[in-house]
Amino acid sequence: MKRAFVFTLLWAFCLACFAQQTLESYEELTDTKPHDGPEVWSQIGSPVQLSWGSVDIRYKKLDVPDVKQSSRLRKKAWKGERIHAQAVLWTNKDLKNVTLKMGDLKSGSSVIPSSAVSTHFVRYVMTDELNPGGGGCGHRENKAEWDSSLVADMLDIAQELDIKANSTRPIWVKVWVPADAKAGKYRGTLTVSGEGMKPMDLTLEVDVLNRTLSAPKDWAFNLDLWQNPYAVARYYNVPLWSKEHFDLLRPVMKMLADVGQDAITASIMYKPWNGQTEDHYDSMIGRMKKLDGTWSYDYTVFDKWVTFMKEDIGIDGLISCYTMIPWALRFDYYDQATSRIQFVEAKPGEEAYKEYWVTFLKDFARHLREKGWFEQTSISMDERPLEDMKAAIAVIRQADPEFKITLAGNYHEEILDDLYYLAIPYGHKFPAEVKARRAEKGQISCVYTCCTETFPNIFTFSDPAEAAWTPIHAVAGGYDGFLRWSINSWTADPLRDSRFRTWAAGDTYSIYPGPRSSIRFERLMEGLQDCEKIRLLREEFKSKGATGKLNRLNKVLAKFTPEGMKEGKQTAAEMVQELDALLNSL
C-alpha cells in the first residue's frame, strides 16, 4: 500500500512537471518530408539572414525561404487596430539563446509604447491533409495513412529559442495601436540577437490613420467560437472548476473577448456530442431523481462558469446551452433510490423524452429568471434532423414558450420562426428576404464552417488568408456573424501535433495551451477587424451620401462569396489584401 501511494505521488509529480515543461520548452517533431540539404544551405551566402516576409506564407522549416530581402516594412493602421507582420530568420549554423526585442514606435514626440507590441517565434506543428475528395471530415485513427508534415502556425510565448543549423524560423510581430494614438508615421526596430550571430535589425513603419476602430466589445459582428473548459483542466492536470482551473481559463477566454466573442458555450447534459473531442463535455447542471420521484437540480457549476465568463472575461452575449438532441440519445441523472448514475434512453417525440426535459426546462427557466439571465439564454442544437428539431421545439414551448432556441445546421423553412439564432453551413442558400425578415424581428442569421469545407477553413495546413476571408464572407453574404464549433479542444499533444483521430489537423483548436495564439487566430482577428471597419465606413458613407465610395466598397466586398471564388481570378490572400488597401484609403 505504501509503495502504491509513493508511486501515485511520483506519477502526479511527473504529470505536473510535464505540463510545466510543455509551457516553457519543448522539441518540435521531426519533419520527414523532402527538404533542402546541406549543399543548398551552404550556398545562402551569409550564414545568418533576416528579412521581412509575408503573413500569407507558412515558411517551411527545413527549406531556404523564398523571400525578397527587405529590411523595411510599411503598414497602415486605424487607431485601436491590431496589425501584424512576419519576419523570417534562416541560418546554416547553430544559434543559441536567440531573443527578440521591439522597442517603442515613435513619430516625433508621439509614441506607441513597446507594451503595445508583442513578438513571437513561430513554432512548427505536425499537420496532415484534406480527404482525397476534399473536406476534412471522417476518422483518422492511423496517422500513417495520411500525408503529414510540419507547418508554421503557433506563436510561442518563450522569450528565447535555440535555432539549429540549416533551418528557418519565422517571427511574428503584432502591434495593437492605442485608440488614443495620434495620427502619423511611426517607426520602430525589431532586433534579433543571440549566441553565434551579430544583432540584426529590421525597421517597421506604421502609418496610423485618422480613423478609429471600435473596441472589440462594441463590434456589431456576432461571433460564436465554442469554448471547451474541460480541455484546459485535462491539459494542466487541475481539478475541474477549482481556482487553479479558472486561473488557467482566464487568459484563454480573454483572447476570445479581445476578438469580439459574443456567446458563452454551456453544456447542460453529459456528452452532448458523444465525446467527439479529446476531452468530452460534462453536464454543468446536476440532476437528481429523489426517492419520492420528484427532481432536483444543481446549478452550481453552470452559475460559476456563466458568472466567470460574464464578469471576469466580459463575454456577455447569448448563453448557448447544448443540447436537447445529442448524438447519443441517452440522458443522465443521479438516482437517489439506487445511489447510481442512470440514463433515460429516449428519442425526441417519445413520452420519456418529454418527461425528462419538460420538468428540467421549467426549473431551469425559473433559475435563469432568478439570476436575471433568462433573456440571454438559449436552448441550442446543432446539425440535427428536422423531425427531431420539431419534437424538441414542441417540448421547449411546452416548458416555457419564451425560451430562445438556436440551431447551427441546415436551413429548414418549417422552423425558421422558432429559431432566435440560425447558423447555416458555408455555401448553403439563405434567402436574402428571409434574412431581412428575421432581422426585423431581432433574430440572428449567421454562417458557419466545420470539417466539411475544403475552402474556407482554418486547418493547420489551410492558407493563412482563409481565416481572414471567412468572416468577411459573412458580411458580404449579408449574415449577422460567424460560428465555428471549437477554439480550444486540444489534442493529446497540442503544442507539437495538431492531428486528431477525427477530422483534418487543426480543426479542433486555433488557440494553443499557454495560452499561445496562432497564425490562424491572428488572421481570423484581422478579418473580424475588417468586418467592423466595413460597418463603420458603410454607416459613414450612407449618412454623408458618399455613394461613390460606398459602391467601391460594396463592389470589392461582393467578391467574398462562393461565386466570387469560383471565378478563380484572385486567391483569398489577394482578395484580403485588396480589401485592406481599400479600407485604409477610403
Regions found by a protein language model. Give the residues of each.
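Mature N-terminal, pre-catalytic/accessory segment of carbohydrate-active enzymes
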Residues: 19-274, 374, 568-586
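Short, glycine/acidic-rich beta->alpha junctions
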Residues: 79, 182, 247-248, 300-301, ...
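Structural detector of well-ordered beta-strand residues that form the stable sheet scaffold
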Residues: 320, 404-406, 446
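Catalytic domains of carbohydrate-active enzymes that cleave complex glycans
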Residues: 330-333, 341, 345-411, 479, ...
